């Protein structure tokens, strides 16, 4: 929670670029997750905000609860709510992981499934 976002962002970017993805795609994922556009992101990087502050300032997307699975050996759904910053960090890392692995953007940016029944 006290790690500086600006120190981790280049690591995310480097990982994605090695896998043929772009800074724009990384920023798109982060914007979907946090509501921060590229200018907001650059300002936060320049400010050297902590992850705690980063997520406190964010407008977390309502569909982040749909992000499930294992990241860095931790199952996201099992992270206790009291560790909210850690949970948000792992959720965002999961999206970045999926991007690095070549998953399509429309699958990464979660949407609620609606059951449409014709009567």
Give the location of each predicted region.
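A charge-rich, low-complexity, intrinsically flexible signal that marks solvent-exposed coils, linkers
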Residues: 1-119
């Amino acid at each position: 929670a006290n790690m500086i976002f600006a120190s981790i962002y280049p690591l995310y970017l480097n990982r994605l670029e090695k896998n043929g993805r772009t800074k724009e795609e990384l920023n798109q994922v982060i914007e979907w997750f946090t509501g921060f556009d590229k200018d907001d992101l650059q300002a936060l990087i320049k400010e050297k905000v902590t992850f705690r502050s980063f997520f406190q300032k964010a407008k977390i997307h309502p569909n982040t609860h749909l992000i499930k699975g294992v990241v860095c050996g931790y199952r996201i759904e099992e992270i206790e709510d009291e560790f909210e910053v850690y949970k948000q960090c792992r959720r965002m890392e999961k999206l970045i992981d999926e991007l690095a692995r070549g998953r399509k953007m429309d699958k990464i940016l979660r949407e609620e499934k609606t059951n449409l029944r014709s009567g």
